[in-house]
A protein has these predicted regions:
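Active-site loop/lid in soluble adenylation, ligation, and acyl-transfer enzymes
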Residues: 1-79
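Fold-independent oxyanion-binding glycine-rich loops
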Residues: 54-57, 97-99, 133-136, 156-160, ...
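Conserved mixed alpha/beta catalytic, RNA-binding, or beta-rich assembly cores of soluble enzyme
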Residues: 67-95, 99-152, 164, 172-173, ...
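Alpha/propeptide regions of enzymes that mature by internal proteolysis
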Residues: 21, 25-43, 47-50, 108, ...
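N-terminal charge/polar-biased segments
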Residues: 1-7, 80-90, 204-212
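C-terminal functional extensions of proteins
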Residues: 159-212
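Short, acidic Gly/Pro/Ser/Thr-rich loop/turn segments
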Residues: 59-61, 101-102, 162, 180
Length: 212
C-alpha cells in the first residue's frame, strides 16, 4: 500500500517524535512546495514559446499572497494589449497563469496546451494564441474574456501546492464571462499533473466538453 501512494503514511515514530526519515522527507516536501509558490516563470521560457504575456496589478509574489484582490484585476494598458492582439476575437481564449505554482506551468504546459488547442480547432472552434497571465487569480479570466469578446475562456492555473505535490494545475472554463460572473458559473478540472489527471487526458476531456 505504501508503494502505491505518495501519501504520508507508515512513516514510523520513536516515542512521540517521527522517524528521522519521515521528518527529513517532510522538510524536503515543505521546501519544494514553498519554493514553487515564490518561483517566477522565466521570461526565456515564455519567449521560446512565443507567448504574449500580460500581468495583473500585482507587482511581486509577496503582494500576490497578501492582496488576492489585485490578482483579479488587470491594468487598462494590459487589457488594451489583449484587445489589439486578439482581433478578430476567437471563440475560445486559453489563458495560462502561474497562480500558486510555477512548477505546474513548467511541468504541464507543453503537454496540455497543444492538444487542447488542436482538439478545440478540430471540433470547429476558432482558438486564439495562448496567453500568459502573470500573478493571476481565477477571476481575472472574466476580465480577459470580456475584453477580448470571446465565447469561452479556459484558464490553466497552478494550484496551491501540497506536501509532496507541487505540480498540480486546474482548468477553469467559463462561458461569456463578465464582471458579474459568479464562481458557480465556472466548470473545473482539477488535480492535473502526471500522478493525477494526466495533462493530455485533461485536454481530451476539455475539448469535447466545449463542443457539446
Amino acid at each position: 500500500f505504501m508503494q502505491s501512494t505518495g501519501a504520508r503514511i507508515g512513516g514510523g515514530a520513536y516515542g512521540t517524535r517521527p522517524s528521522t526519515t519521515a521528518y527529513l522527507r517532510f522538510l524536503a516536501d515543505h521546501a519544494r512546495s514553498k519554493g514553487t509558490v515564490f518561483r517566477e516563470v522565466p521570461e526565456e521560457w515564455l519567449l521560446r514559446r512565443g507567448m504574449l504575456a500580460v500581468q495583473t496589478l500585482v507587482e511581486d509574489k509577496d503582494t500576490y499572497l497578501t492582496r488576492p484582490d489585485l490578482g483579479r484585476v488587470l491594468s487598462e494598458a494590459s487589457l488594451q494589449t489583449v484587445r489589439e492582439h486578439y482581433r478578430p476575437a476567437p471563440q475560445v481564449l486559453i489563458v495560462l497563469s502561474d497562480g500558486l505554482s510555477t512548477d505546474a506551468v513548467l511541468a504541464n504546459a507543453d503537454e496540455i496546451v497543444p492538444p487542447l488547442t488542436n482538439g478545440l480547432r478540430q471540433a470547429g472552434f476558432t482558438v486564439g494564441d495562448p496567453l500568459f497571465l502573470r500573478y493571476g487569480r481565477v477571476k481575472a479570466e472574466d476580465r480577459l474574456g470580456e475584453a477580448v469578446g470571446c465565447d469561452v475562456v479556459l484558464m490553466l492555473v497552478g494550484e496551491r501546492p501540497g506536501l509532496g505535490q507541487s505540480e498540480s494545475m486546474s482548468c477553469y472554463a467559463v462561458y461569456r464571462p463578465t464582471a458579474a460572473t459568479l464562481e458557480s458559473d465556472r466548470s473545473v478540472i482539477s488535480n492535473i499533473h502526471r500522478e493525477g489527471t494526466p495533462p493530455v487526458e485533461a485536454a481530451a476531456s476539455t475539448a469535447p466538453a466545449k463542443s457539446g
